[in-house]
Regions:
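N-terminal low-complexity segments that are often proline-rich with Ser/Thr-Pro
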Residues: 2-20
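Phosphate/diphosphate ligand-binding glycine-rich loop within oxidoreductases
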Residues: 25-103
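An anion/phosphate-binding loop that grips the pyrophosphate of nucleotide cofactors and donors
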Residues: 21-22, 186
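Short glycine-/small-residue-rich Rossmann-like dinucleotide-binding loops
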Residues: 26-30, 49-50, 193-197, 222-223, ...
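Rossmann-like adenosine-cofactor binding region
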Residues: 163-245
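Generic hydrophobic/aromatic pocket-lining and core-packing "Φ" positions
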Residues: 58, 96, 137-138, 158, ...
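Glycine-rich phosphate/diphosphate-binding loop of Rossmann-like nucleotide-binding domains
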Residues: 106-191, 241
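Adenosine-phosphate binding glycine-rich loop
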Residues: 72-113, 122, 223, 228-323
Length: 323
């Protein structure tokens, strides 16, 4: 029987050891380095992994012999990522809130109020990526009174956003030219581009920073997948920002961790049915009966079973066998 180790929430770590009785279910968050040696064959770990931007974690999972089923690559037939949606909704909203906070002069920003006031223009926000995070960020920023621009490479998605978002949100097709044009007077940039299971593309390079005004705030929600900005590196809630060439970078890898009461409930609502299926049926039968869950298999008993992860690290890929 497989020991099941899974995260029902994004932010709370309840048990600190995998060495428990057989069939015990541990509530666990994303693995950290001191815990790698505790992983072993016979365990199913169901949580966020983001292996495409963490070689050390990938190697540890392969070495462990455990079955690693990643929340972020569970994907339904209509291309939805149901276990990313709740955290994306939280992170997108928080991205605009945090961007507005660090736009204050006392925090290194330009000293602008997101909404402006009568007779004074509001802040300008550029959202890169029109997925769940981007839509949530744009909607929140618009609700705060900002002038918002959102980019994507899908025209059908841009049409949908144009129809559904408030009038102070404008859609742009994502090209380097269009992005550079908006950077000249932007106040906040939210990076929210996602390639499922793969590294995020760098849409803003270091040389593009000089086109922005000092005090511009970059919020990189895609930092878990390597980040949308070339100058991004992961930060923490205790030390969330840093500056590069006068540009404020916010790149906290677990943004929803700041609002655990909301994010815990939201993620539990999405993950519980999958966790129960794994516990009741075993991982092979559960993945055999649910194609979305099958796509979550990233590493199985020493083999990488998610192609994007294998390709990023130049490792052998082998489809998971669940028959």
């Amino acid at each position: 029987m497989y020991q099941i180790v899974f995260a029902l929430n994004y932010v709370v770590l309840v048990f600190k050891s995998y060495m428990c009785a057989e069939n015990t279910r541990n509530v666990y968050s994303q693995s950290i380095k001191p815990e790698y040696p505790l992983l072993k064959h016979g365990q199913l770990v169901f949580t966020y992994f983001h292996l495409a931007c963490d070689l050390e974690l990938t190697e540890a999972m392969v070495k462990s012999g455990a079955v690693c089923l990643a929340y972020e690559t569970v994907q339904t037939a209509d291309k939805r990522l149901p276990l990313l949606v709740p955290m994306s909704e939280v992170a997108g909203r928080m991205a605009s809130i945090n961007g507005a906070y660090y736009l204050q002069k006392t925090k290194g920003g330009k000293g602008k109020l997101m909404s402006g006031v009568p007779g004074v223009k509001p802040a300008k926000v550029l959202v890169l990526g029109g997925g769940i995070v981007g839509e949530a960020a744009a909607r929140m920023a618009a609700g705060m009174g900002a002038e918002v621009y959102i980019t994507d490479i899908s025209l059908p998605r841009l049409r949908q956003l144009d129809a559904e978002l408030p009038a102070n949100v404008h859609t742009l097709y994502s090209t380097e030219h269009n992005i550079r044009k908006e950077l000249k007077d932007v106040d906040i940039v939210v990076g929210s581009v996602l390639v499922p299971g793969d590294k995020a593309p760098h849409l803003i390079t270091r040389d593009m920073l000089k086109e922005m005004e000092p005090g511009t705030v970059l919020v990189d929600v895609a930092i878990d997948q390597g980040g949308c900005f070339e100058t991004s590196h992961p930060t923490t809630h205790s030390d969330p920002v840093y500056e590069v060439d006068g540009i404020v970078h916010y790149a906290v890898a677990n943004i929803p961790g700041a609002v655990p009461n909301t994010s815990t409930a939201a993620l539990t609502n999405a993950t519980l049915k999958y966790a129960l299926a794994l516990a009741d049926k075993g991982w092979k039968k559960a993945c055999r009966e649910d194609a979305a869950l099958y796509k979550g298999l990233n590493v199985v008993e020493g083999k990488i079973t998610f192609k994007a992860v294998a390709d990023v690290w130049g490792m052998p890929y082998e489809p998971a066998q669940v028959g």
